[in-house]
A protein has these predicted regions:
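ABC ATPase nucleotide-binding domains
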Residues: 71-230
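Pre-Walker A (P-loop) beta-loop-beta motif of ABC nucleotide-binding domains
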Residues: 23-34
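Helix-to-loop junction immediately C-terminal to a conserved catalytic motif
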Residues: 51
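The feature captures the beta-strand-to-loop junction immediately N-terminal to the Walker
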Residues: 36-38
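A short, flexible loop at the N-terminus of ABC-type nucleotide-binding domains that lies
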Residues: 1-6, 11-22, 71-72
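Non-catalytic connector elements of ABC transporters
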Residues: 238, 250-357
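ABC ATPase nucleotide-binding domain
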Residues: 5, 26, 62, 337-339
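Conserved ABC transporter NBD signature motif
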Residues: 59-67
Length: 357
């Protein structure tokens, strides 16, 4: 197998439309890289350039030592799974699995062997004689994945393959994809806007916005150590609390309460405090960094209640904190004291949005 590399990749449709800006990535053998971001961030355009379906404006794409930047899509030895499944409606499952190999004139005996192996892996043997219209969404998705696997490609590309499935089925197929591609020993590039897919499937996540890679790191690092405000706000559900607050000496003021700042090289007039709702908890007597406020909204999530609190403040518009709290208490309209542990607080620059240092 081979390493997939993107070097300073750019795509320009017009002077004002530049969806991909100077992206450099490397995907090792057996590595599962997810391109994660909102609509219009450049993730699908990047995938299409890797596949050869979109022309590169500037930059290079390597598969192993070979420069494939301008190589025809059909000659790249990559396999792609599309959002729309792209199955032939007039063909049976067996014929769909074999179709790509027949076009490449693979010997019939080898086609039979590969199709049988993949069908056993994906549990498709009993569906061989059915056509796509006779399959469920999950079954069609497995056939689409199977069409990619029979190729025995040097790299696999998946473009939002679960977006057409309902939530329960998406969870099951997600687990299948993780197991299946872990066994392929090839680079995998997966595109999604769904952070749950990105966090559960990936060995590396590249968070994209406005054509740029905002952060490239393992999922745990993306979640626990976001590089900037965009990553902090985009990854995580419920969303991280992000509050722009004034600084006073070595402290920041959250409402009427003082939050100790780390030892920064400079003291800004304002700073953005970030803390995830699961890290905000009911204060204990020994907690030293606390804020008080009143609950104004409670959302029951089953295992937790998402509680929104207006922090006590002399300001006209008091800041709001959200906390994930135990479900066995009625928090409605309660006065509450919350602890904000220093080790769970992130600080961001107001101007650049980057982590403040």
């Amino acid at each position: 197998m081979a390493i997939l590399q993107l070097k300073n990749l750019n795509k320009t449709f017009s002077p004002k439309v530049i969806p991909v800006k100077d992206i450099s990535l490397s995907v090792e053998d057996s590595e599962f890289l997810t391109l994660l971001g909102p609509s219009g961030c450049g993730k699908s355009t990047t995938l299409r350039m890797i596949a050869g379906l979109e022309e590169v404006t500037r930059g290079k794409i390597f598969l192993g030592t070979e420069d494939i930047t301008y190589k025809r899509a059909g000659d790249r030895n990559m396999a792609m799974v599309f959002q729309s499944y792209a199955l032939y409606p007039h063909m049976t499952v067996r014929e769909n699995l074999a179709s790509g190999l027949k076009l490449k004139k693979v010997p019939s005996g080898e086609i039979q062997t590969r199709v049988t192996e993949v069908a056993e892996l994906l549990g498709l043997e009993d569906l061989f004689q059915r056509k796509p219209g006779q399959l469920s969404g999950g079954q069609r998705q497995r056939v689409a994945v199977g069409r990619a696997l029979v190729r025995k490609a040097e790299a696999y590309l998946l473009d939002e393959p679960l977006s057409n499935l309902d939530a329960l089925l998406r969870e099951r197929v997600r687990a299948d994809i993780k197991q299946i591609f872990a066994a392929q020993k090839a680079p995998v590039v997966y595109v999604t806007h769904d952070q749950t897919e990105a966090m559960t499937l990936s060995s590396q996540v590249a968070v994209l916005n406005n054509g740029y890679v905002q952060q490239l790191a393992p999922p745990a690092d993306i979640y626990n150590h976001p590089a900037n405000l965009f990553v902090a706000g985009f990854v995580g559900s419920p969303q991280m609390n992000l509050l722009t607050i004034p600084c006073k000496g070595n402290s920041a003021m959250l409402g009427d309460f003082s939050i100790t700042l780390p030892k920064f090289s400079s003291s800004p007039p304002q700073i953005v405090l970030g803390i995830r709702p699961e890290h905000v908890r009911v204060a204990l007597p020994e907690d030293t960094q606390t804020v008080k406020g009143r609950v104004y909204l409670v959302e029951n999530l089953g295992m937790y209640k998402l509680v929104s609190v207006r922090v006590a403040s002399s300001q006209t518009e008091p800041p709001t904190l959200r906390a994930l709290l135990p479900p066995d208490q009625n928090w409605d309209n309660e006065e509450i004291t919350l602890a904000l542990p220093s080790e769970n607080i992130h600080w961001f620059d107001v101007e650049s949005g980057d982590v403040f240092q």
